[in-house]
Amino acid sequence: LLITPTIDLNTAQASARDDRIAAWNDGMGNEWRVELPAAVKGAARIAIEPDHMPPSVRAYVNGLVEAQKLEAITPILADMRMIKSEQELQLARHAGQVANAMMTGGRAAIADGVPEYEVAIATSQAGTRKAAELLAAHYDDADMSPNTHFLQIMASGETITKTHHRATTRVMNRGEPVFLCFCGMTNFHRFKLGFDRTFWIGDIADETQADVYEVA
């Protein structure tokens, strides 16, 4: 049973691998709660993922089902998720290709006199184009977007120690370090990768930075 907002019903019907789809609207009847009593009625045990449930849903389920009938299935699902099919492995490799394209595009855009946001634009464009290429060659999901998204995490010069700093209008200068992080924005076909790299523009102006980098 898939319970979805009415506004997303068409998408659910086109994409979901489920023969039971129920739609609901804000403020109409009992909203998303309508289908749940019948769905759990008579069940001896009900598996849930406690840490993945919205508080309102968890509270409703707690009032609907006796506590002794609820069982956390997260450990079992976590083990299952560690087993990858050939299709999933291919997806991971393709996500890696998108990641490499983003890093290559970002590195090529780094230069003396260039503002940080130009690097962010370059990484997004490079990743999107590689993703589009892979989608066209290997996948038949017409609704899957190739666009990468999320704000680019990067820092340069004196801001280098701000780990989750976003790309700004700051102009980068020769000799400065430039940190690029792609955690959260390197995504392909719902598969995400996280990694980062540090570069310097030309020769390193402060040699102690190289020593710190070697330790890290």
What are these model-predicted stretches?
Residues 1-216:
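Active-site neighborhoods and metal-handling regions in enzymes and metal-associated proteins
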